[in-house]
């Protein structure tokens, strides 16, 4: 999510790109996609994101709601799922549990609300307004007058309790990891941030897991057929096995399909000799899976 040099050369605005598409357009192309031989469609995350360049869905602002920019007055997410099923096709929903965007999250860190009259208003970050009487608004009453860099630090100050701009206590429920590291490959890859706009969620927190499982369970109940998990390597496999996979399989059935991104930026078999963040650690076949076998045949 950057304003690239070629954008500037082409005089492209620093606003919302038109690459997102919507459910209505996808429904109109289902016959074409099926004719190509595809039986399933893997879509980007549908959850509400902040604004502007958050076009791809990977910077959650509210996990529990579908981004209105994908919808039309007459076509919602459920309509896409139903339309695909009517044609014998499946919907694979891309999901994220590792992180949110840096404007907080409606349940984990309620800091902002969106104020807009039309979808065009969502093109600008100016639609993001601090929630009155929130911890964020009380701590930074002059947020709008801060320079962009300090605005970013103010948001992290609340989400990760960085104490960079004030010494108060924030995120007292530990919904986020408070490590300051920013790295894709390091021993803190599962507790630090992978990027400035991806604030690491404390996926080991049972309350966080309960919230995320409720949210994604609702999508399964809508009829989503499978999950593709983004940044899977950045969540401990032990955490996934303990808190997340059992819940999704209980909701979706023993055969509910999940696959994920275990992306490394090295050519080594073992990622920096750390098995816990290496691809094989996430792909070993297990013939004796207690949580799957306990589900029975439903």
Q: What is the role of each PLM region?
A:
Residues 192-203, 237-245:
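Active-site cleft segment of glycoside hydrolase catalytic domains centered on the general acid/base Glu
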Residues 1-90, 105, 192-198:
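N-terminal structural segment of carbohydrate-active enzymes
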Residues 80-88, 98-99, 111, 132, ...:
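Active-site-proximal helices and loops of the catalytic beta/alpha 8
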Residues 1, 42-53, 95-104, 231-236, ...:
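Short, solvent-exposed turn/loop segments enriched in Gly/Ser/Thr/Pro and often Arg
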Residues 52-64, 98-184, 273-280:
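Aromatic- and acidic-residue-enriched segments that line the glycan-binding/catalytic groove
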Residues 19-32, 201-221:
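Short, acidic/polar
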């Amino acid at each position: 999510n950057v304003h690239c040099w070629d954008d500037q050369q082409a005089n492209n605005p620093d606003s919302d790109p038109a690459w997102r598409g919507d459910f209505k357009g996808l429904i109109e192309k289902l016959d074409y996609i099926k004719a190509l031989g595809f039986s399933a469609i893997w879509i980007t995350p549908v959850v509400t994101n902040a604004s502007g360049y958050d076009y791809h869905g990977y910077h959650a602002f509210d996990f529990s709601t579908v981004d209105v920019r994908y919808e039309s007055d007459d076509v919602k997410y459920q309509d896409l799922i139903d339309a695909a099923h009517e044609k014998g096709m499946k919907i694979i929903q891309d999901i994220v549990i590792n992180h949110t965007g840096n404007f907080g999250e409606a349940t984990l860190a309620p800091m902002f609300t969106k104020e807009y009259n039309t979808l065009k208003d969502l093109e600008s970050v100016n639609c993001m307004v601090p929630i009155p009487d929130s911890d964020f608004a009380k701590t930074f009453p002059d947020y709008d007058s801060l320079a962009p860099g300090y605005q970013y630090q103010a948001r992290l100050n609340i989400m990760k309790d960085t104490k960079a701009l004030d010494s108060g206590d924030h995120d007292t429920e530990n919904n986020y990891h408070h490590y300051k590291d920013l790295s894709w490959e390091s021993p803190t890859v599962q507790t630090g941030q992978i990027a400035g706009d991806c604030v690491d969620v404390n996926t080991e927190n049972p309350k966080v897991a309960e919230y995320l499982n409720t949210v994604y369970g609702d999508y399964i109940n809508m009829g989503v057929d499978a999950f593709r998990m983004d940044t899977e390597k950045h969540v401990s496999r032990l955490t996934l096995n303990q808190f997340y996979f059992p819940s999704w399989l209980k909701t979706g059935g023993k055969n509910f399909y999940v696959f994920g991104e275990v992306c490394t930026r090295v050519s080594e078999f073992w990622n920096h000799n750390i098995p816990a963040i290496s691809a094989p650690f996430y792909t070993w076949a297990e013939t004796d899976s207690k949580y799957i076998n306990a589900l029975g045949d439903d």
